[in-house]
């Protein structure tokens, strides 16, 4: 991918993120708590998550392996951090899910397209288009790297713990919804989304990559409206007093 193509992709993805942000305040993505048959054909939720998330893991792996900097310390570490998240998201998280919920095929396919494009954005910059000499070993001793990596792992910890809290709300066979109360859910209604946003802000800080900042924009554009919808749903089901002053 050339520099001009890369810059066009960043601009296009940024513009699309703004459109998605607005649209999701009017249209609830029909997966998880908002699953509805109106979205048409659906697939097993576990299979859907694997097929949706695995492409970005594989695209990043391909771009890294074919680059000349693949074993340089900084790019290699960036690669490991990115793949750590997506290995868990693609090949562990889906199989920890409980229940027999479904994922609309349309949402899965849109997720595949986004993840392929995001993998291209991240990998092209980190392994091919970053200015020569930028990501030397000295990068790993910069304040931005250390601040970013701390944020990254704090966010990952919040995300993983919040997912665990959600999974353990129900006993086997129970299909009711419950208001999560532990961990970050004491402060926000979507602790898992908050953790993921912090995680990718950390990645953007530690890499100073323009592609990573576009991904932060996308993460916010996708998750903030959904967090708002979930908060409203909790208020409807459990009452405003139960939800309290938790942020979205």
What are these regions (language model features)?
Residues 57, 100, 122, 159, ...:
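Short, solvent-exposed loop/turn segments at secondary-structure junctions
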Residues 93, 106-125:
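Active-site pocket-lining segments that scaffold enzyme catalytic pockets across diverse folds
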Residues 23-35, 87-91, 100, 125-131, ...:
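Juxtamembrane interfacial secondary-structure elements that flank transmembrane helices
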Residues 1-87, 92-109:
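Membrane-helix and juxtamembrane interface regions of eukaryotic multi-pass membrane proteins
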Residues 62-66, 117-130:
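Juxtamembrane "helix exit" motif at the C-terminal ends of alpha-helical transmembrane segments
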Residues 2-23, 60-71, 114, 136-248:
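Hydrophobic transmembrane alpha-helices
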């Amino acid at each position: 991918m050339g520099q001009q193509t890369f810059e066009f992709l960043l601009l296009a993805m940024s513009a699309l993120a703004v459109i998605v942000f607005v649209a999701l305040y009017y249209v609830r993505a029909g997966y998880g708590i908002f699953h509805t048959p109106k979205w048409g054909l659906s697939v097993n939720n576990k299979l859907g998550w694997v097929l949706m998330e695995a492409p970005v893991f594989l695209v990043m792996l391909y771009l890294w392996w074919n680059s000349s900097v693949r074993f340089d310390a900084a790019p290699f570490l960036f690669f490991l951090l990115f793949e750590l998240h997506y290995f868990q998201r693609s090949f562990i998280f889906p199989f920890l899910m409980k229940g027999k919920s479904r994922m609309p095929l349309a949402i899965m396919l849109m997720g595949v397209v986004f993840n392929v494009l995001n993998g291209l954005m991240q990998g092209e910059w980190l392994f091919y288009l970053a200015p020569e000499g930028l990501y030397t070993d000295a990068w790993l001793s910069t304040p931005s790297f250390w601040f970013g990596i701390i944020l990254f792992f704090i966010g990952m910890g919040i995300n993983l713990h919040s997912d665990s809290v959600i999974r353990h709300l129900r006993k086997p066979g129970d299909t009711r919804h419950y208001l999560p109360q532990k961990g970050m859910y004491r402060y926000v209604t979507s602790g898992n989304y908050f953790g993921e946003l912090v995680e990718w802000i950390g990645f953007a800080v530690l890499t100073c990559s323009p592609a990573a900042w576009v991904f932060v924009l996308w993460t916010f554009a996708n998750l903030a409206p959904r967090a708002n919808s979930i908060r409203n749903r909790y208020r409807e089901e459990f009452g405003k007093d139960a939800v309290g002053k938790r942020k979205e």
